[in-house]
Amino acid sequence: MFVPFHKIKQQGFTLLEVMIAISITALIGVASTNLLSNIIETKNVTDKRSEQLVTLQRFNQFISRDVEQIINRGIRDQYGDDQAAIILDDSDYLAQWSRLGWRNSPINDDPRAEIQRVAFQIFDINDEECEAAKLRLESWGKLAPEGSCLIRFFWPMLDRASETEAKTQILLDLVEDIEIELLATTQTPVDQESKTTPERNWYTQWPNLQTGDTKEIPTAMRWRITLPEIGQVERLWLLAYDDQ
């Protein structure tokens, strides 16, 4: 039976339907791209924060071991001059002190002292001392970092010869500011009443010039560190300092 052409039912899509389908597909594509981009960005931020936390934990481990084992043992420097057991804010370092707990290797034929001298200083991130830190920061996408790196120094012997060189470790790749303070407590002379309350003072420089019968001994140390994107981190340690 012959059916006129104008009576045949159309089976395809209209132009409007095609345009709607294309628009929906495009919207889904844009949404998927944005979602993937957000996931990648979130992962990068998470990885970066994770690296920062790992670095901060490593720093905390080093500093805690160093501070908690401070000992009252002065040294002679490379010029033969006597140096105090604890020094804050001198011309060479932010801080330096003597610490116990530097164990000898059981297979070491030349045993060294088990007391170690450590020191800390910051350098501009573009200085040679911070080269490894800058490379790490660049690998994380921070191409033009501004700030300083924190370096730990330690020596193979306490009383140093003129040619003795310190070994170094980068503790923090990028810091904005570091403040180190020492809490000192007055030591009451024996002939005073036992009810006298010892006086406590915070110092950013040590040793403090002590006069008269009043003598101060270090009882605590505080570090305030300002880190980019994290802010200020504060740590406080009590010192088991034997003033004998």
Can you say where each PLM-predicted feature lies in the sequence?
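Short, mixed-charge, low-aromatic patches
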Residues: T14-I24, G74-R76, R224, G231
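Short linear sequence signals and composition-biased patches located at protein termini or domain-edge surfaces
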Residues: E165-Q244
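N-terminal single-pass transmembrane signal-anchor helix
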Residues: M1-L36
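Extracytoplasmic beta-strand-rich oligomerization domains located immediately C-terminal to a leader/signal peptide
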Residues: S37, E41-A161
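Acidic surface patches and DE-rich sequence motifs
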Residues: K9, D77, L227
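Short, charged/polar micro-motifs that form catalytic or ligand-binding hotspots
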Residues: V18, R49, L53, E165, ...
